[in-house]
Amino acid sequence: MSYPLFLCKKNSDFMKVEQIYTGCLAQGAYYIESDGEAAIIDPLRETAPYIAKAKSNGTTIKYIFETHFHADFVSGHLDLAEKTGAKIVYGPEAETGYSKHLAKDGEVFKLGKVTITVLHTPGHTPESTTYLLKDEVGEPYAIFSGDTLFIGDVGRPDLAQKKGHLTAEDLASWLFDSLRNKIMPLPDHVLVYPAHGAGSACGKSMSKETWDTLGNQKQTNYALRADMTKTEFIEAVTDGLLPPPVYFSANAKLNKMGYESIDTVMARGAQALSPDEFEKIANETQALLLDVRGKEVFVKSFIPNSIFIGLQGSFAPWVGALIPDLKQPILLITEEGKEEEAVKRLARVGYDNVVGHLAGGFDAWVNAGKEVDRVETIDVDTFATRYTADLNLLDVRKPGEFDAAHVKTAQSFPLDFINEKMSKVDIKNQYYLQCGSGYRSTIAASILRARGFDKLINVQGKFNDIAAGPIPTVTAACSLGKS
């Protein structure tokens, strides 16, 4: 979705800034326009929206500014530059496998009647850069802070570690200096436009808000506390970091070295396959069967050995967390009309090898008389009637959610690390699976079922509803002691 245009504070027509926010990635790209020229900051992989916007406004895309080598999505800088002739700009320390302008700290770029100044702000990564937008009279208006500064948080400092050379503590030290020397001295009225909001794995405790004033962040963001020492800062930003999703390093490499054109990826994924063709490819190759329909229809029945990750949830991050090989051939099962969206959203996180989709969707498979499978699914009320202290309950929520509150007898089995946790479960046992809403438990059930577990019961419903019922639960503070 796109947020409304945020016009400059003087309400004149020399500049406009639009945040283009993609909820499933919790990612913000930016369109800046002034006097017939436009710049895009941290674009997503699909380039059409930016090109269409510039064409509609009668502007030329002059620059593509990248704040760093993104790890959680594949940026659209290469395709956008190829199609528009715009110059790709990175800050210092960004060595790439393609042509770009390597800007110096303090370098100024003119865009129409405004300017954009490079502020090298290493810490999240060595090349991390913040871009300072100044208005027609040279007054600071906004910063595009990438993963250096979020609303309520800062970027995690562990993604660019180099064993024996660069530690998370080293990067956190740089981040402290970047914030104090480059960002905090700016005027309080300056707007902060980060690359991510709540839900991204690039930080720990981001706000649901996606922009703010720097002055308010100085008052509310723990990392900008004026009296915080560097030691305190390093401890705060490195404490409690979960391992990054497995696809992060691969995405960062694609952004650094280059990737296949999105048009080629979309064309390959557009291949429609009959049920017989789909089955033949599935049987003869190592293709992964990925079902992206809604969980409400998936739980009724699905193609044997298919994995569920529904488009309606945090699709791309879960794909990245659960499918370790970006080159994995993928066959799609979608709702009719959702084929292109599925291919596009996979490409956003570097999964470019979709080899086709089931023409006519799951109904075509059923109508062709093909085999189907299902996992028993129950609601919260039914679960309450079946619950006993000795049943095997897998809570697939994140460790922090589990620690905050969980069913007393549940085993923490976080979906993020299901591949690593397989040795903790016995294929002979019966397991109930539960999460916060039913989306993640359905993903987990599909993965376990594809690996031969046939005694699974998927609990659909909110954890809060489970906690409100008779089943004993434990919170971080105490046991709720229900019987």
What do these predicted regions represent?
Residues 14-60, 131-146, 151-152:
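Conserved beta-strand hairpin/beta-sheet module of binuclear metal-dependent hydrolase folds
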Residues 156-158, 169, 216-253, 257, ...:
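Rhodanese-like catalytic fold shared by cysteine-dependent sulfurtransferases
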Residues 47-89:
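Active-site metal-binding motif and surrounding structural segment of the metallo-beta-lactamase
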Residues 43-44, 69, 93, 125, ...:
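Active-site metal-binding loops of divalent metal-dependent hydrolases
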Residues 40-41, 61-70, 89-93, 120-123, ...:
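Active-site neighborhood of phospho(di)ester-bond hydrolases with catalytic His/Asp-centered motifs
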Residues 38, 125-243:
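Metallo-beta-lactamase
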